[in-house]
Swiss-Prot record:
Keywords: Cytoplasm, Golgi apparatus, GTPase activation, Phosphoprotein. The modification Phosphoserine is found at residue 427. Interacts with RHOH. Interacts with the non-phosphorylated forms of RAB1A, RAB3A, RAB5A, RAB5B, RAB5C, RAB8A, RAB8B, RAB12, RAB35, and RAB43. Interacts with RAB10. It is found in: Cytoplasm; Golgi apparatus, trans-Golgi network. PANTHER family: RAB GDP DISSOCIATION INHIBITOR ALPHA, RAB GDP-DISSOCIATION INHIBITOR. The keyword Thylakoid does not apply. This is Rab GDP dissociation inhibitor alpha. GO terms for cellular component: axon; endoplasmic reticulum; Golgi apparatus; midbody; myelin sheath; neuronal cell body; presynaptic cytosol; protein-containing complex. Disulfide bonds: none annotated. One of its GO terms (molecular function) is Rab GDP-dissociation inhibitor activity. GO terms for biological process: negative regulation of axonogenesis; negative regulation of protein targeting to membrane; positive regulation of axon extension; positive regulation of toll-like receptor signaling pathway; protein transport; Rab protein signal transduction; response to calcium ion. High expression in brain, lower in other tissues. Regulates the GDP/GTP exchange reaction of most Rab proteins by inhibiting the dissociation of GDP from them, and the subsequent binding of GTP to them. Promotes the dissociation of GDP-bound Rab proteins from the membrane and inhibits their activation. Promotes the dissociation of RAB1A, RAB3A, RAB5A and RAB10 from membranes.
Amino acid sequence: MDEEYDVIVLGTGLTECILSGIMSVNGKKVLHMDRNPYYGGESSSITPLEELYKRFQILEGPPESMGRGRDWNVDLIPKFLMANGQLVKMLLYTEVTRYLDFKVVEGSFVYKGGKIYKVPSTETEALASNLMGMFEKRRFRKFLVFVANFDENDPKTFEGVDPQNTSMRDVYRKFDLGQDVIDFTGHALALYRTDDYLDQPCLETINRIKLYSESLARYGKSPYLYPLYGLGELPQGFARLSAIYGGTYMLNKPVDDIIMENGKVVGVKSEGEVARCKQLICDPSYIPDRVQKAGQVIRIICILSHPIKNTNDANSCQIIIPQNQVNRKSDIYVCMISYAHNVAAQGKYIAIASTTVETAEPEKEVEPALELLEPIDQKFVAISDLYEPIDDGSESQVFCSCSYDATTHFETTCNDIKDIYKRMAGSAFDFENMKRKQNDVFGEADQ
């Protein structure tokens, strides 16, 4: 280990593994360490099931009705991939797709007035949906056509809207959309967690709705993908990539000290040895004195023996409970997957309810989601602090990732990756040179 590296990475969470992979591909000499004996850090998938019970201190362990423990891979952090989103682009660029198999998530649902409705995925579905009345549908359709045609580089498509100055609230007003449709659009399509976006310039929201539509157009049923065997496969895929390009991996490796000289990182000490480096990437757990708390997320993992009611017996789905529907500031999310994804025993389903904590009683906050899941065989409750770095790392050359937020997709994680890359490399992370690999995640060439 006593060697000189360009970059040392601590922790094998998804953010760290993707950056390690990209740095290795770019010719950097990388050492990647993790104090845990497994990959994934906060974003790992726990197997066998007995391990999950131990982790949550449920002493009696799983009953026989749960099937074989090793048939389970339970994600600690529930997220799906947007089919046309940034993480899929990163997977394609790096060809990490060859190590993974994906399934399309069967449906996306939204909560309204105590019931759940399918988020319409085609114009036909939108016209048949009970989410809105007839006149509302026509106005909504006009709005969707406007969004689909909108091109920030072509003022002819603006229809009097200024992408940098017109607020999203004003765009909704222009199309005369009612509150329910606004909730649905902002939270189930643009995937905002709160309503703060309403008074921001509309371009970001328009692009988010476009991402949703383009992701949906890719495979049909929903815009989301999920890897067989769980999300823990993602960091491992990027770790393999790093190793192929010469990266060195060490699991179960305690980190004794991060060595600084004149305020700048020069190495990492482990078990009496020092590995030197020019730059360091890590997750917040490795540098508690350089991060600040930015809130909390509650995640409740629920094991079910049945599909969720009113989802058409889907073996995977997402449910969004918009904050307005339950008098909150932040949305509540449910991600559900099952034995169909090789993450649970035959006939079993895993539903994870999560939200940003707003009160002193977080479990009460997710009750509307849990009611949709009854009966629940077993619950595992996790309340996690969210951390972010206190500085940008430009002086210390220590670059820390942010904790994984309550969103049910990886777009915010990818923004963090691009941001860290830019701070480390001094130039923007460029997707353009990724277009060499024009295949989709199922290995079919784009037409």
